Amino acid sequence: MPSHSRSRDRYRSERDPSRRYREVYDDDDDDDFDYHPRERRRYRRDDYQHDIRSHESPNYNDDLNEYDAAAEDPAVPLRSHDVEGRRRERSRAGESPIASPSRRDRNRGGEEYRRHGTYGDGGSPTRAMRDRRHRSRDGQRARPRDMDREARRQRRRERARGAAAMKHKSSDSTNSGSHLLSADALAKLRSHYDEEDQRERSQEQEQPRMESKRQRKRPIVGDEPQALAPFPDETPRGQSKGRIVSGAYLEEGHPEMEVRHRGGGGPAMEARWRKEGNWDGTMEGSDAQPPFWKRKKWWIVIGVLVVVLAIVIPVAVVMSKKHGHDDDKSGSSSSVDNSDSPYISSLDGLSHDSIPESAQGSILDPWTWYDTRDFNLTFTNETVGGLPIMGLNSTWDDSTRPNDNVPPLNESFPYGSQPIRGVNLGGWLSIEPFIVPSLFENYSSKDRIIDEYTLCKKLGSSAASTIEKHYADFISEQDFIDMRDAGLDHVRIQFSYWAVTTYDDDPYVAKISWRYLLRAIEYCRKYGLRVNLDPHGIPGSQNGWNHSGREGVIGWLNGTDGQLNRQRSLDFHNQISQFFAQPRYKNVVTIYGLVNEPLMLSLPVEDVLNWTTDATKLVQKNGISAYVTVHDGFLNLSKWKQMLKDRPDRMFLDTHQYTIFNTGQIVLNHTDRVKLICNDWYNMIKEINTTSAGWGPTICGEWSQADTDCAQYLNNVGRGTRWEGTFAIGDSTVYCPTADTGPTCSCASANAPPADYSDGYKKFLQTYAEAQMSAFGTAQGWFYWTWHTESAAQWSYKTAWKNGYMPKKAYAPDFKCGDDIPSFGDLPEYY
């Protein structure tokens, strides 16, 4: 009997096929809880193990060689400076000898001591004390200079009078009357002396100012050792922060060292400090002008400049917003630089003035978008359910169909009588590491970039531009054309709550994915594809797996914020259900998901069922007529026979089936794997789809043709594989068909490019896929996981379809259950 969900691990490591068929489908236990090394339950993209005796969150045994379980690496501590040590250095600096005699002559030791004794609170002398001291010193210096000047003047006059008298008394011909000084000559001589006196008076007037300049740079170190006063803890406002000179350098007594009033060095050290970036002065000697910031006129100039800039800058910004966007398509108000985007040509010829100034730079401003293709760029701030309709066209056409086997959108799809043939858009709007490894592989294991939460947090301010570029590049209109051409008719689109809002300290890129979701729905409409909405991540995380946004603890209906996140998830559905209840979505959004893969093996089952009922009633009250899906929560499908019996109308049960996360199924050889699908799964799905023996309408929302778990990051970032026995720490058990007999299984062939696949391997992969299509087609149908991947070829429908190991048309497979299983040639079982 069947072992049906990807969570089921009935077969485990059994090599005796008879045991498999002794198992019965109606076993009411969740048949997954033996503790044999090969019998641990595994799920897609995780290593969950569960103890049925409790509802505790799963215990994730992360590889300690990859991830340190301790806290993040501690920050490097700031250097601790010893205040007393610095003071001692300054004290020793005061004791260092000054080599220049001229400096010692100018030193006024007693005056310096008294000046330091009159410092104010800011560490400098009070203004009144400075004025008094300057006046006192100026007067004392002036008196001896006046006496010297008068003595020199008197001596010159006496010499002049003596010379004149000698000329009159002399009988020498050279001193005769013909050479006597005339009155004019005497007047000129007096004028010469008067000019000399005037120069001396000018020098006297200039002397106080020069003395003031010198005093500002007067050394505090004289012949006698003196100690510097301690520096204040905080530099007073307006006082320059002098560079503190190394005490060791001062103690060495370098002759070129000069010390300034606040601990800085003189000209000899200027070049060195300028290189260090800590010295802003321009003085070339002790008598140079003070720095510009100490000059009053510079303060006035700076003040005027500040006022002018305060006026000019805001005006320039406003003018650039109003007039600068015609020449700059990216927009000056854009929060993201999209100038390198190849997808904004639709802005050509448009004026940014069409966007109200209040909306410029916002999420509604197309000039901030990385991709404007196929959006209506006419501005509107209209919302439905609080969600914007910006980008949507006001008209639509529902007359399209993807192929002649299905009705057009404006006619009802015959659910129940015709199977869904669809694909998922995993890894696009809800990022998943194994689908887009390029976003994760450049980080080291120490960074622990393991999900969208940690990725966005690491990216910081560049998260929006990086993530939106992924949105624009990963899926395009051509993908929907290819889906139609591949014979598909439905698309399950993953998105998460941050498309609508974010909470608390969420690092997610908020709201940008919303417009990409809306455009994807319009592409589906254009090519006749119906849509299944799939909220892949809801507040708090419903399963603690990386594809919910954040790997770790389950915070939805569980833990401290369990009830808060319960309400937040209902608020989320209240908004999006109002939006998608609009008439424009009635024909295209035909399936409405509530939450992807809630881990009911850990969560209280009744709480999940009650929330499911409340959410379904809420969205249907808001006008949703689409089928509402509830996931099986990884419980045994037989249990669902008795669950939600009084549920609202128009509901689907959603089950996800994989063989590679079940250690009892991954060890099956190629032929037995096809038999498992056609014998066990076929009957299981057929039965659960009935209301008499099962639950009722059931879809398979996820499955794949992957036959190994070898894809990079499939089992979480940094984890190994079951296929090669590197999955779990301390457990090297290998789960593959030749584990016991050899040869050794390898991921090399499974991860090889599809061009290297042998014909036998391609035949197996296509038969394996078509067997699952046949089994799930007995119910409401299927959605392949997933349409596109960067490198995981066995998980990409597009890659398989283009490389010849998927049917050319999904509705025309080569194999169906009941047919003879074809030969796969000499295909080895170890890959």
Curated annotation (Swiss-Prot):
GO terms for molecular function: glucan exo-1,3-beta-glucosidase activity. The keyword DNA damage does not apply. It holds the Pfam family Cellulase. InterPro entries: Glyco_hydro_5 (IPR001547), Glycoside_hydrolase_SF (IPR017853), Glycosyl_hydrolase_5 (IPR050386). The active site is at 597 (proton donor), 702 (nucleophile). Residues 1-179, 192-241 are annotated as: Disordered. It is an enzyme of class 3 (hydrolase). It comes from the Eukaryota. Residues 1-24, 44-56, 79-93, 102-115, 137-151, 198-213 have a biased composition (Basic and acidic residues). The keyword Glycoprotein applies. Its main location: membrane. Residues 319-831 are extracellular. One of its GO terms (cellular component) is extracellular region. Keywords: Carbohydrate metabolism, Cell membrane, Cell wall biogenesis/degradation, Glycoprotein, Glycosidase, Hydrolase, Membrane, Polysaccharide degradation, Signal-anchor, Transmembrane, Transmembrane helix. Glycans are attached at residues 376, 381, 393, 410, 442, 546, 558, 610, 636, 669, 689. Belongs to the glycosyl hydrolase 5 (cellulase A) family. PANTHER family: GLUCAN 1,3-BETA-GLUCOSIDASE 2, GLUCAN ENDO-1,6-BETA-GLUCOSIDASE B. Glucosidase involved in the degradation of cellulosic biomass. Active on lichenan. This is Probable glucan 1,3-beta-glucosidase D. It comes from Aspergillus oryzae (strain ATCC 42149 / RIB 40) (Yellow koji mold).
